[in-house]
């Protein structure tokens, strides 16, 4: 089945509406993404500016006490695994694929809460610096985030082409990076803080 950009925009708009209702997101929080959807921008394409959809995985251990962070090569920061959305993936599958690629881990799984709700745990739009060597101006990533569970005793083998390293960290480290995501995870009972 061919990818339909208009259907993808409708899907993201409906997700935004349901997410905003579930998590009491203030009006205007995702104004740029909503404007891009209304304008018919190809938000699925990493070449669409001023912003496009990315997905990320909030990788948690089984107890919900630790998170796996990667040291992002291009940004030089510790972040949750994630990357550009690639059609025709489902959004959650995109986040899972990115986590597996960047960490080299197998046996990761989308948290069961997502199957019941059909929602991400967070949607965050954040500024990305220009990368002239890639022909990319400063722009925005509209990051759709999913909780992902790791099996016990799975070896982490980060992809050196993508990341400098990967480490299990305490949840306060994730909270510094993605405070609203951790607040939502806590509200849903998915973490033990």
Task: Give the residues covered by each predicted segment.
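Basic/polar N-terminal segments that are highly enriched at the extreme N-terminus
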Residues: 1-2, 193
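Membrane-topology and secretion signals of cell-surface/extracellular proteins
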Residues: 3-4, 8-9, 13-24, 47-50, ...
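Acidic, metal-coordinating catalytic segment for phosphate/diphosphate chemistry
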Residues: 18-56
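Conserved aromatic-histidine-acidic binding/catalytic patches
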Residues: 45, 83, 134
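N-terminal strand-loop-strand
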Residues: 45-80
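Aromatic- and glycine-enriched beta-alpha-beta binding-site module
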Residues: 66-100
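Unchanged
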Residues: 86-182
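Charged phosphate-binding loop/patch that engages nucleotide di/tri-phosphates or the phosphate backbone
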Residues: 177-193
